[in-house]
Swiss-Prot record:
Gene3D superfamilies: Transcriptional coactivator/pterin dehydratase
Record GO terms (molecular function): 4-alpha-hydroxytetrahydrobiopterin dehydratase activity
Lineage: Bacteria, Bacillati, Cyanobacteriota, Cyanophyceae, Oscillatoriophycideae
Pfam families: Pterin_4a
Reactions performed catalytically: (4aS,6R)-4a-hydroxy-L-erythro-5,6,7,8-tetrahydrobiopterin = (6R)-L-erythro-6,7-dihydrobiopterin + H2O
Name of the featured protein: Putative pterin-4-alpha-carbinolamine dehydratase
Organism: Picosynechococcus sp. (strain ATCC 27264 / PCC 7002 / PR-6) (Agmenellum quadruplicatum)
Lineage: superkingdom: Bacteria
Length: 92
C-alpha cells in the first residue's frame, strides 16, 4: 500500500502543480475544452495511463468541462501516486 503524505508533503507537491488544488482528501483539476467531443476525447486519453499505474481517477464530465479528482482510497488520502498521475495527466 502507498504511504499517505503529510500536510507538509502535500503542500510541497502542490507547489509543483499550480493547476491542481486540494479539496478534502483529494487533488482536483478542471480541464476546459471547445466542446463535448473534445472533452470525451480527453477522458479517453486518461484510460491508458490510469490503467498502467493501476490508479484510477474520479472523473466528472459537464459538456466541455472535465473535472479530475485523485486520491488513494486504500491509504485514506493523498499519496505520491496521486501526484505522479496528475503529472502524467498534465502532459496530455
Amino acid at each position: 500500500m502507498a504511504t499517505r503524505l503529510t500536510d507538509t508533503e502535500i503542500q510541497a507537491q502542490l507547489s509543483q502543480f499550480p493547476e491542481w488544488s486540494k479539496v478534502d482528501n483529494k487533488i482536483q483539476r478542471r480541464f476546459k475544452f471547445k466542446n463535448f467531443i473534445e472533452a470525451i476525447d480527453f477522458v479517453n486519453k486518461l484510460v491508458e495511463p490510469a490503467e498502467a499505474a493501476d490508479h484510477h481517477p474520479d472523473i466528472e464530465i459537464s459538456y466541455n468541462k472535465v473535472t479530475v479528482n485523485l486520491t488513494t482510497h486504500d491509504a485514506g488520502g493523498l499519496t505520491q501516486k496521486d501526484f505522479d498521475l496528475a503529472g502524467t495527466f498534465d502532459q496530455l
